[in-house]
Amino acid sequence: MEKLNSKYFFEPFAEPEISFRIKDDIDISKAPYSMDNIKNLLDGILCSIEIVDFRFNKPLADIGAINLVSTNGASDYWIYNDKIYNIDEIDLTDFEVSFFIDNKLQEKGNTNNVLENPLNAVLWLINTLCKKGEPMLKNQFISSGSCTKAYRLNTGTRIKADFGKLGLIEFEYI
């Protein structure tokens, strides 16, 4: 089981997410892409946990969501399963993800918590980057957004996200 050392984090939270791998370099001249062709750009899906860490010296409420996102001020670490699944392996509009702390169920989340379908987040990101002239490249990953609320990590806890047939992500925060 992976161990994350608390000395490298300030105020971390864990978010279970469905992630995607890019199949080939994306041709920006073919943008904008749509839900009809987005799957053709993707090699597969995998389960992951993003560790967000707030490194500001004032409370999150004083920073504001726009400032936080615009500075990429929360993304810090990404844990992922090595197994890549076919994108049609699950129903992305309704797939349950269970989140545990010390083997106690905290929440049964769902992929529909990510803009109703994680592919909507992927589509937005790819089209936004294409507009800026920044293509995504083969084998890059996209983490689509949390299926549950974010959970604070406390030293000495064990974290597990159960993605059903896509597998488990587990780690200990020491």
Where are the predicted features?
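Beta-rich strand-turn-strand
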Residues: 130-140, 144, 150
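Short, well-ordered amphipathic alpha-helical segments that serve as non-catalytic structural scaffolds
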Residues: 121-128
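Catalytic-core "active-site belt" of small-molecule-metabolizing enzymes
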Residues: 1-116, 123, 154, 158, ...
